[in-house]
């Protein structure tokens, strides 16, 4: 019986000690919708930066499109030059032109 009493007392002490640690103060509840002054300010700054870089993005896109068009035209010109019936026509890869072997002048096959 004495042993049972000691174990019960020890269990009661441990339960009391642990229950004090496990209790949390839950009388306050904070709910944020995510729509506060900081997020609105961040969104406004992001929009302003996006608008400020608009012309730069347009320039980059135009340049990319221009380079792609140039490569596309050169590919077609090379294809036409290589398929040409003119035996003196050859494709110059450095200048991206079809030239005459004898004169070195540009020819249109």
Curated annotation (Swiss-Prot):
Designated name of the protein: UPF0482 protein ESA_01750
> Quick check: keyword Signal in the entry?
yes
- Family membership, please give it: Belongs to the UPF0482 family.
Coiled-coil features, chain-numbered ranges: none
Residue ranges annotated as compositionally biased, kind Basic and acidic residues, are: 38-55
**InterPro entries hit by this protein:** DUF1283
User: Region (Disordered) spans which residues?
Assistant: 38-63
